[in-house]
Design a protein with these regions (language model features):
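Helix-coil boundary/capping segments in enzymes
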Residues: 1-151
Length: 151
């Protein structure tokens, strides 16, 4: 049974993508990719609730590949409905794997979501005011492309 079993149409107006380390760079035009550093998650809180243990010395991209594999594991998928409100951040179904998002909405019983980034607002603002208008526009386009692709 869906989390929202009221029979009402629900549109979630505050959903977030959990960006992977290279999400923005992967969505950027080639001219800007090398100028966009990967996310580093310096506080570590973002990764603490993930479905795997991250080794502080592990390459983050490799760690996220392991995390994506965990999200596809039969036992993990089988527990999604029961755990939909318990899984947070990168552990949440549909948090960073676009193909899982429709399934998460179905479990939640939501008709749609308005999706925002989680980690890039301050960076986008900094780039907007950096004086490099081409880079600011390039990163904004990468952001919008990434959000659109995810949804």
């Amino acid at each position: 049974m869906a989390y929202n079993s009221t029979g009402l149409v629900v549109h979630d107006a505050d959903a977030h993508i959990m960006e992977t380390p290279t999400w923005l760079r992967d969505n950027a035009d080639p001219a800007f990719r090398d100028r966009i550093d990967a996310l580093t998650y310096p506080g570590g809180n973002e990764l603490q609730q993930s479905a795997i243990e991250f080794d502080e010395n592990e390459d983050l991209v490799a760690g996220f590949e392991r995390l994506a594999q965990r999200h596809q594991a039969p036992d993990y998928v089988a527990a999604e409905e029961a755990e939909i409100m318990l899984r947070k951040n990168y552990a949440a179904t549909g948090s960073f794997i676009a193909e899982d998002r429709p399934r998460a909405l179905g479990i939640l019983g939501f008709a749609s979501q308005l999706v925002f980034n989680t980690f890039y607002n301050s960076r986008l603002c900094e780039w907007e005011h950096s004086g490099d208008i081409d880079f600011a526009i390039g990163t904004a386009r990468a952001h919008n492309r990434g959000i659109s692709e995810f949804c």
